[in-house]
């Protein structure tokens, strides 16, 4: 490889890393503001999830440049995991405060470290172990302060969402499945289950709820 090619390769790596950080920041901002949007939608959590996923499906298809999907085992497993993560988070926002839900979901790095060690047999670095210990202590104090039944259930669902997000992160990295593809299948799964919930508990549609759902998507 010539000097020019090496310089170009290094520049591309820097740009790629910067882009990844930008996506992480945008994701954090999106998740952090989702909790407030949920409060404007007084629907069944399954219906909320289905409505936002319906919009998300088209966004993912456009970003991917194709709406074709393979319903292979890796894709279906990823779709189920993604659906479960989203549904737990939506339900948590209905049963506890938005701040509680997002803080507990953001414990997922701790579970990434634990699952990498337990399942993938990857040795954790010292800083990862320290981070995990601090987060575990924080969670313990958090639940000691939130003993009311309603909040406790919501907090547990938010914690489950964090665990499932960690599983989803590792699955996306090591399964070899197309992340956007199984994300689209997850959207279809959510819409199908949400359609059944609409029959049993029809939502009251308002302009505010529609704007909030589009924002959530």
Description of each model-found segment:
Residues 59-70, 110-124, 166-177:
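C-terminal ends of transmembrane helices
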Residues 30, 35, 67-105, 113, ...:
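Specific transmembrane alpha-helical segments of multi-pass solute transporters/efflux pumps
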Residues 4, 60, 82, 114-117, ...:
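Hydrophobic transmembrane alpha-helices of multi-pass small-molecule transport proteins
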Residues 48, 179-185:
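Juxtamembrane helix-start motifs in multi-pass secondary transporters
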Residues 47-50, 54, 90-123, 161:
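Specific alpha-helical transmembrane segments that line the substrate/conduction pathway
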